[in-house]
Amino acid sequence: MTKIAMANFKSAMPIFKSHAYLKELEKTLKPQHFDRVFVFPDFFGLLPNSFLHFTLGVQNAYPRDCGAFTGEITSKHLEELKIHTLLIGHSERRTLLKESPSFLKEKFDFFKSKNFKIVYCIGEELTTREKGFKAVKEFLSEQLENIDLNYPNLVVAYEPIWAIGTKKSASLEDIYLTHGFLKQILNQKTPLLYGGSVNTQNAKEILGIDSVDGLLIGSASWELENFKTIISFL
Protein backbone atom coordinates (compact mmCIF):
# COMPACT_ATOMS: atom_id res chain seq x y z
CA MET A 1 0.00 0.00 0.00
CA THR A 2 1.22 3.52 -0.84
CA LYS A 3 2.48 5.39 2.22
CA ILE A 4 0.70 8.60 3.30
CA ALA A 5 1.71 11.75 5.22
CA MET A 6 -0.89 13.99 6.86
CA ALA A 7 -0.18 17.32 8.58
CA ASN A 8 -2.52 18.48 11.34
CA PHE A 9 -2.00 22.18 12.05
CA LYS A 10 -4.40 22.07 15.02
CA SER A 11 -4.90 25.70 16.20
CA ALA A 12 -1.22 26.55 16.22
CA MET A 13 -0.52 28.04 12.79
CA PRO A 14 -0.87 31.82 12.20
CA ILE A 15 -3.34 32.48 9.38
CA PHE A 16 -1.00 34.03 6.84
CA LYS A 17 1.75 31.53 7.61
CA SER A 18 -0.75 28.77 6.90
CA HIS A 19 -1.68 30.31 3.55
CA ALA A 20 1.97 30.77 2.59
CA TYR A 21 2.77 27.19 3.67
CA LEU A 22 0.03 25.74 1.45
CA LYS A 23 1.15 27.73 -1.57
CA GLU A 24 4.81 26.81 -1.07
CA LEU A 25 3.98 23.13 -0.54
CA GLU A 26 2.06 23.13 -3.82
CA LYS A 27 5.19 24.40 -5.61
CA THR A 28 7.36 21.75 -3.95
CA LEU A 29 5.30 18.63 -4.64
CA LYS A 30 4.36 16.82 -7.83
CA PRO A 31 1.01 15.49 -9.09
CA GLN A 32 1.78 11.97 -7.84
CA HIS A 33 1.70 13.33 -4.27
CA PHE A 34 -1.98 14.33 -4.50
CA ASP A 35 -3.40 11.23 -2.80
CA ARG A 36 -0.35 10.70 -0.57
CA VAL A 37 0.05 14.09 1.13
CA PHE A 38 -2.76 15.74 3.12
CA VAL A 39 -2.87 19.00 5.07
CA PHE A 40 -5.48 19.95 7.70
CA PRO A 41 -5.30 23.67 8.59
CA ASP A 42 -7.68 25.31 11.04
CA PHE A 43 -10.71 27.07 9.54
CA PHE A 44 -9.00 30.43 9.09
CA GLY A 45 -6.04 28.74 7.46
CA LEU A 46 -8.16 27.18 4.72
CA LEU A 47 -8.04 28.35 1.12
CA PRO A 48 -10.29 27.38 -1.80
CA ASN A 49 -9.06 23.94 -2.76
CA SER A 50 -7.45 24.42 -6.14
CA PHE A 51 -4.33 22.48 -5.16
CA LEU A 52 -3.21 19.76 -7.56
CA HIS A 53 -0.24 18.29 -5.69
CA PHE A 54 -1.73 17.54 -2.26
CA THR A 55 -5.15 17.09 -0.66
CA LEU A 56 -6.62 19.77 1.59
CA GLY A 57 -8.84 18.71 4.48
CA VAL A 58 -10.53 20.09 7.59
CA GLN A 59 -10.02 19.21 11.24
CA ASN A 60 -13.72 19.26 12.06
CA ALA A 61 -17.17 19.91 10.61
CA TYR A 62 -20.73 19.82 11.88
CA PRO A 63 -22.93 17.04 10.47
CA ARG A 64 -25.48 19.20 8.66
CA ASP A 65 -25.72 20.84 5.25
CA CYS A 66 -26.23 24.32 6.75
CA GLY A 67 -28.43 26.08 9.29
CA ALA A 68 -28.52 27.77 12.71
CA PHE A 69 -25.37 26.23 14.18
CA THR A 70 -23.45 29.15 15.64
CA GLY A 71 -19.70 28.82 15.31
CA GLU A 72 -19.78 25.68 13.17
CA ILE A 73 -18.70 24.89 9.63
CA THR A 74 -21.00 22.63 7.62
CA SER A 75 -20.89 20.56 4.45
CA LYS A 76 -22.15 23.45 2.29
CA HIS A 77 -19.17 25.56 3.35
CA LEU A 78 -16.83 22.72 2.50
CA GLU A 79 -18.46 22.14 -0.87
CA GLU A 80 -17.93 25.82 -1.73
CA LEU A 81 -14.25 25.41 -0.88
CA LYS A 82 -14.12 22.10 -2.81
CA ILE A 83 -12.95 20.23 0.30
CA HIS A 84 -14.05 16.61 0.73
CA THR A 85 -11.70 15.29 3.44
CA LEU A 86 -11.99 15.62 7.21
CA LEU A 87 -10.77 14.31 10.55
CA ILE A 88 -13.26 12.72 12.93
CA GLY A 89 -12.62 11.49 16.47
CA HIS A 90 -9.31 13.18 17.26
CA SER A 91 -8.55 12.70 20.95
CA GLU A 92 -8.47 16.46 21.56
CA ARG A 93 -12.08 16.68 20.38
CA ARG A 94 -13.08 13.61 22.37
CA THR A 95 -11.49 14.82 25.61
CA LEU A 96 -11.39 18.63 25.52
CA LEU A 97 -14.64 19.17 23.59
CA LYS A 98 -16.48 16.16 24.99
CA GLU A 99 -17.50 14.65 21.65
CA SER A 100 -19.28 11.42 22.52
CA PRO A 101 -19.20 8.11 20.61
CA SER A 102 -22.81 8.69 19.52
CA PHE A 103 -21.97 12.14 18.13
CA LEU A 104 -18.89 10.77 16.35
CA LYS A 105 -21.10 8.12 14.76
CA GLU A 106 -23.53 10.84 13.68
CA LYS A 107 -20.65 12.76 12.08
CA PHE A 108 -19.31 9.65 10.41
CA ASP A 109 -22.66 8.60 8.97
CA PHE A 110 -23.44 12.11 7.71
CA PHE A 111 -20.14 12.66 5.92
CA LYS A 112 -20.14 9.09 4.66
CA SER A 113 -23.46 9.93 2.97
CA LYS A 114 -21.64 12.85 1.30
CA ASN A 115 -18.82 10.52 0.17
CA PHE A 116 -16.14 12.41 2.11
CA LYS A 117 -12.76 10.87 2.78
CA ILE A 118 -12.89 10.35 6.54
CA VAL A 119 -9.76 10.07 8.68
CA TYR A 120 -11.10 8.43 11.83
CA CYS A 121 -8.83 8.79 14.86
CA ILE A 122 -8.61 6.28 17.70
CA GLY A 123 -6.25 5.80 20.62
CA GLU A 124 -6.01 4.82 24.27
CA GLU A 125 -4.95 6.73 27.38
CA LEU A 126 -1.90 5.71 29.40
CA THR A 127 -4.06 4.15 32.13
CA THR A 128 -5.48 1.74 29.56
CA ARG A 129 -2.04 0.92 28.13
CA GLU A 130 -0.74 0.19 31.63
CA LYS A 131 -3.46 -2.44 32.13
CA GLY A 132 -1.91 -4.52 29.36
CA PHE A 133 -2.39 -5.23 25.68
CA LYS A 134 -5.69 -7.05 26.18
CA ALA A 135 -7.19 -3.86 27.64
CA VAL A 136 -5.80 -1.84 24.73
CA LYS A 137 -7.36 -4.21 22.19
CA GLU A 138 -10.75 -4.06 23.91
CA PHE A 139 -10.64 -0.26 24.09
CA LEU A 140 -9.69 0.25 20.44
CA SER A 141 -12.26 -2.31 19.29
CA GLU A 142 -14.97 -0.35 21.12
CA GLN A 143 -13.87 2.88 19.44
CA LEU A 144 -14.38 1.26 16.04
CA GLU A 145 -17.70 -0.44 16.84
CA ASN A 146 -20.05 2.28 15.62
CA ILE A 147 -18.58 3.02 12.20
CA ASP A 148 -18.69 1.24 8.85
CA LEU A 149 -15.26 -0.38 8.55
CA ASN A 150 -15.97 -1.28 4.92
CA TYR A 151 -16.53 2.33 3.86
CA PRO A 152 -14.15 2.70 0.89
CA ASN A 153 -13.21 6.31 1.75
CA LEU A 154 -12.12 5.47 5.29
CA VAL A 155 -8.64 6.04 6.71
CA VAL A 156 -7.95 5.05 10.33
CA ALA A 157 -5.32 6.88 12.39
CA TYR A 158 -4.05 5.23 15.57
CA GLU A 159 -2.82 7.91 17.97
CA PRO A 160 -2.11 6.74 21.52
CA ILE A 161 -3.21 9.68 23.65
CA TRP A 162 -0.22 9.30 25.96
CA ALA A 163 2.13 9.94 23.02
CA ILE A 164 0.42 13.01 21.52
CA GLY A 165 2.42 16.19 22.09
CA THR A 166 4.66 14.53 24.67
CA LYS A 167 7.75 14.22 22.46
CA LYS A 168 7.66 10.51 23.34
CA SER A 169 6.37 8.31 20.56
CA ALA A 170 5.15 4.80 21.17
CA SER A 171 7.95 2.25 20.83
CA LEU A 172 8.36 0.48 17.51
CA GLU A 173 7.28 -2.74 19.23
CA ASP A 174 4.10 -1.12 20.58
CA ILE A 175 3.27 0.26 17.13
CA TYR A 176 4.00 -3.09 15.46
CA LEU A 177 1.77 -5.02 17.87
CA THR A 178 -1.09 -2.51 17.91
CA HIS A 179 -1.15 -1.98 14.15
CA GLY A 180 -0.96 -5.74 13.64
CA PHE A 181 -4.06 -6.14 15.80
CA LEU A 182 -5.94 -3.31 14.06
CA LYS A 183 -5.12 -4.71 10.63
CA GLN A 184 -7.03 -7.86 11.63
CA ILE A 185 -10.15 -5.74 12.27
CA LEU A 186 -10.00 -3.33 9.34
CA ASN A 187 -10.79 -3.91 5.70
CA GLN A 188 -7.52 -4.82 3.98
CA LYS A 189 -7.91 -1.79 1.68
CA THR A 190 -8.25 0.69 4.57
CA PRO A 191 -5.04 2.67 5.21
CA LEU A 192 -3.89 2.60 8.85
CA LEU A 193 -1.79 5.56 9.98
CA TYR A 194 0.24 6.15 13.13
CA GLY A 195 0.29 9.46 14.99
CA GLY A 196 1.80 10.53 18.29
CA SER A 197 5.02 12.57 18.59
CA VAL A 198 6.11 11.73 15.04
CA ASN A 199 9.11 13.81 13.98
CA THR A 200 11.92 13.90 11.42
CA GLN A 201 14.06 11.62 13.60
CA ASN A 202 11.60 8.73 14.00
CA ALA A 203 9.34 9.00 10.94
CA LYS A 204 11.46 6.84 8.64
CA GLU A 205 11.71 3.99 11.17
CA ILE A 206 7.98 4.07 11.87
CA LEU A 207 7.17 4.07 8.15
CA GLY A 208 9.40 1.00 7.84
CA ILE A 209 6.83 -1.07 9.76
CA ASP A 210 4.77 -2.97 7.18
CA SER A 211 1.47 -2.40 8.97
CA VAL A 212 2.00 1.39 9.09
CA ASP A 213 0.51 2.87 5.92
CA GLY A 214 1.38 6.44 6.80
CA LEU A 215 1.65 9.11 9.47
CA LEU A 216 -0.63 11.74 11.01
CA ILE A 217 1.78 14.44 12.14
CA GLY A 218 1.19 17.28 14.57
CA SER A 219 3.79 19.83 15.64
CA ALA A 220 6.58 18.32 13.53
CA SER A 221 4.61 19.34 10.43
CA TRP A 222 4.22 22.99 11.41
CA GLU A 223 7.53 23.91 9.79
CA LEU A 224 7.41 23.23 6.07
CA GLU A 225 10.99 21.96 5.83
CA ASN A 226 10.29 19.33 8.48
CA PHE A 227 7.16 18.16 6.69
CA LYS A 228 9.04 18.00 3.38
CA THR A 229 11.68 15.83 5.06
CA ILE A 230 9.02 13.41 6.30
CA ILE A 231 7.38 13.36 2.85
CA SER A 232 10.74 12.34 1.38
CA PHE A 233 10.55 9.12 3.44
CA LEU A 234 7.32 7.97 1.76
From Swiss-Prot:
Per the record, the gene is: tpiA
Species annotation = Helicobacter pylori (strain ATCC 700392 / 26695) (Campylobacter pylori)
Q: Name one GO biological process term.
A: gluconeogenesis
> Where, by residue number, does substrate bind?
N8, F9, K10, G165, S197, G218, S219
Record note on quaternary structure: Homodimer.
Listed PANTHER family: TRIOSEPHOSPHATE ISOMERASE
Q: Record's SUPFAM superfamilies?
A: Triosephosphate isomerase (TIM)
Similarity comment: Belongs to the triosephosphate isomerase family.
Protein name as it appears in the record? Triosephosphate isomerase
Listed transmembrane segments: none
Q: Keyword Isomerase, does the record have it?
A: yes
